[in-house]
UniProtKB/Swiss-Prot annotation:
Binding site for pyridoxal 5'-phosphate: 25-29, 113
Single GO molecular function: cysteine synthase activity
Record-linked InterPro entries: Cys_Synth/Cystath_Beta-Synth, TrpB-like_PALP, TrpB-like_PALP_sf
Gene3D superfamilies according to UniProt: 3.40.50.1100
Annotated pathway: Amino-acid biosynthesis; L-cysteine biosynthesis; L-cysteine from L-serine: step 2/2
Reactions catalysed according to its record: O-acetyl-L-serine + hydrogen sulfide = L-cysteine + acetate
The protein's name: Cysteine synthase
Obligatory cofactor(s): pyridoxal 5'-phosphate
Gene this chain is encoded by: cysK
Species, as recorded: Staphylococcus haemolyticus
PANTHER family: CYSTATHIONINE BETA-SYNTHASE (PTHR10314)
Length: 155
């Protein structure tokens, strides 16, 4: 509400944003930025990203997953559930595959939760179609994963 949302509005001055996606850990980014963006762009779709293996926001049961920082296993008090319009669930494997792909193809060293955000944003962009602007936040840096299986390449 105080930092990320206003910064996005400033950076996108004069442009339309059709969807904003953020992973839900504490819910702070989605709630705060989502509020600011809904005020500026009344038709924007705000999308929560949660682990497929722990779909608590969707009404499912909590479970173990690999999307560090997302899916605490409960709905945090800091999450304004009225802000988001939809939820995209992302699996462990596709989040990791996406992180690896953007590292190899785009030079973006992203962590697992960032891989989840990128995957969800691509899904939403395909759904909305050509000419729409989809924005997400990459919450994790891949540097902390360099010694893990995420960035252990065989090829």
């Amino acid at each position: 509400e105080l930092t990320t949302g206003p910064e996005i509005v400033e950076q996108f001055e004069g442009k339309q944003i059709d969807a904003f996606l953020a992973g839900v850990g504490t819910g702070g980014t989605l709630s705060g930025a989502g509020k600011v963006l809904k005020e500026k762009y009344p038709n924007i779709e705000i999308v929560a990203i949660e682990p497929e293996a722990s779909p608590v926001l969707s009404g499912g049961e909590p479970g173990p997953h690999k999307l560090q920082g997302l899916g605490a296993g409960f709905v945090p008090d800091t999450l304004n559930t009225d802000i988001y319009d939809s939820i995209i669930q992302v699996g462990n494997d596709i989040a990791m595959e996406t992180s690896r792909r953007v590292a190899k193809e785009e030079g973006i060293l992203a962590g697992i939760s960032s891989g989840a955000a990128i995957h969800a944003a691509i899904q939403k962009a395909k759904e909305l179609g050509k000419g729409k602007t989809v924005l997400t936040v990459l919450p994790s840096n891949g540097e902390r994963y360099l010694s893990t299986p995420l960035y252990s390449f065989d090829d």
